[in-house]
């Protein structure tokens, strides 16, 4: 934890008190895992506080430009402030927009930590409801936007609940986007996976399968999780 209610990482700070969805393990995993090395244009859909965009800015080449699209006005303003205070303020642009109407030059990499609660669940905070209900951005809207905005040789990287992975892969196939990498995320050794990190690319591909265990059986962070996140966490 850092100043105020935000998080201080090794190279940047994220305030998230005006964002419906807070900094969490899903976003940190995606920001550390997504394949950004060869990307020159990156899009973060539903950026929230800007966490993933800033993590990718830290990991990417100096000539990589990152656009972070966020629908909620308060979150977009806070993401803009977080980006402005970061070392990569010239490379990260926050755009307040619905992704369904957003237009831009195609991207080499599109990332998203999308909403995943189904309609019918209630939240006291309307902004949290908007951020997490699939009524705000459903899987087909998300993947249609990826199809429209992705460069021919680009990739999409997502983190989703395991229960949603089959739906995502079924819909993505309608847009000729298929799994390149399927990585199960296991919270603790011996447990079932509850999240999946997905990479999608154009055309049928050989899919690399693997897993990331966050905590070993004794409760300590696994070597793989430390390898992924140590460039970011202060005490790792």
From Swiss-Prot:
Instruction: Give the record's GO biological process terms.
Output: methylation; tRNA processing
Compartment annotation: Cytoplasm
Gene3D superfamilies linked:
Vaccinia Virus protein VP39
- GO terms of molecular function: nucleic acid binding; tRNA (adenine-N6)-methyltransferase activity
Give a yes or no for keyword Lyase in this entry. Answer: no
Q: Which SUPFAM superfamilies match?
A: S-adenosyl-L-methionine-dependent methyltransferases
EC supergroup of this enzyme: transferase
Q: Does the keyword Methyltransferase apply?
A: yes
Catalysed reaction, written as an equation = adenosine(37) in tRNA1(Val) + S-adenosyl-L-methionine = N(6)-methyladenosine(37) in tRNA1(Val) + S-adenosyl-L-homocysteine + H(+)
The record's Pfam families line, in alphabetical order, gives:
MTS
Q: What is its EC number?
A: 2.1.1.223
| GO terms under cellular component | cytoplasm
Keywords attached to this Swiss-Prot or TrEMBL record, sorted alphabetically, are: Cytoplasm, Methyltransferase, S-adenosyl-L-methionine, Transferase, tRNA processing
Q: What is its main location?
A: cytoplasm
- Family, per the entry? Belongs to the methyltransferase superfamily. tRNA (adenine-N(6)-)-methyltransferase family.
Q: Which HAMAP family match?
A: tRNA_methyltr_YfiC
Q: What does this protein do?
A: Specifically methylates the adenine in position 37 of tRNA(1)(Val) (anticodon cmo5UAC).
Q: What is this protein called?
A: tRNA1(Val) (adenine(37)-N6)-methyltransferase
Source organism: Aeromonas hydrophila subsp. hydrophila (strain ATCC 7966 / DSM 30187 / BCRC 13018 / CCUG 14551 / JCM 1027 / KCTC 2358 / NCIMB 9240 / NCTC 8049)
